[in-house]
Regions:
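Conserved catalytic-core segment of nucleotide-activated headgroup transferases in glycan assembly
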Residues: 1-42
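Soluble or luminal CAZymes and related metallo-dependent hydrolases
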Residues: 7-14, 121, 149-153
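Short beta-strand/turn micro-motifs composed of small residues
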Residues: 32-34, 69, 87-89
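Catalytic binding pocket for nucleotide-activated donors in carbohydrate/polymer assembly enzymes
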Residues: 40-50, 73-148
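Acidic, amphipathic alpha-helical patches
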Residues: 56-58
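Flexible glycine/serine/alanine-rich "lid" or loop that lines and gates the nucleotide-sugar donor pocket
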Residues: 61-62, 80
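Acidic donor-binding loop of glycosyltransferase active sites
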Residues: 62-70
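C-terminal alpha-helical cap of glycosyltransferases
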Residues: 145-167
């Protein structure tokens, strides 16, 4: 499933090369969390025969060394489980301003560098991205994943219901 402005003929070979590079650097095997709207599962020949798993993104990220994020809400799991993130895009994806801004906004927020998978990146650059600021992850949780209210969830819901139906 590909909701990005890219062609499979360019995107998948570049992604396969990037995965191979990471596997070599970190001596591990990349496992792909398939998009929930797809039925792609099992061995994907167009991605180097890597395993794709469906509906197990949270579990995969929880047990991972890092997460490779392509404009995905899966970022939330990486934040919650404090996993390093690689924010990736391609030359084609750069042409979609909304998509590219999304990647850049995330890399700015987390004070990291996004990776263009169509360009070469040194091993030292890749390894430097493994280090992340846990405080920024906490800030993200507070800014985007929780309520600003100090009340407990049941109090927020009760207050809402009272305002809507009883007052």
């Amino acid at each position: 499933h590909l909701d990005m402005p890219v062609t499979p003929e360019k995107w998948y070979p570049a992604l396969d090369n990037f995965f191979s590079y990471l596997e070599k650097i970190f001596n591990l095997r990349i496992i792909i969390a398939s998009h929930p709207k797809t039925d792609e599962e099992g061995c994907l020949d167009y991605l180097g025969n890597r395993t794709a798993v469906l509906n197990k993104t949270e579990k995969l990220i929880r047990g991972s060394e890092f997460a490779i994020i392509v404009n995905s809400t899966a970022l939330i799991f990486a934040i919650v489980y404090k996993k390093p993130i690689f924010l990736i895009y391609s030359n084609e994806a750069k042409k979609d301003l909304a998509m590219f801004r999304g990647v850049n906004n995330m890399s700015d927020y987390f004070k990291t560098k996004s990776i263009n998978i169509d360009e070469s990146v040194s091993e030292s650059q890749i390894k430097s991205l493994i280090n992340f600021d846990e405080k920024l992850y906490e800030n993200y949780k507070n800014d985007f994943l929780t309520s600003n209210s100090k009340n407990k969830n049941y109090q927020i819901i009760l207050e809402y219901l009272n305002k809507q139906f009883f007052i």
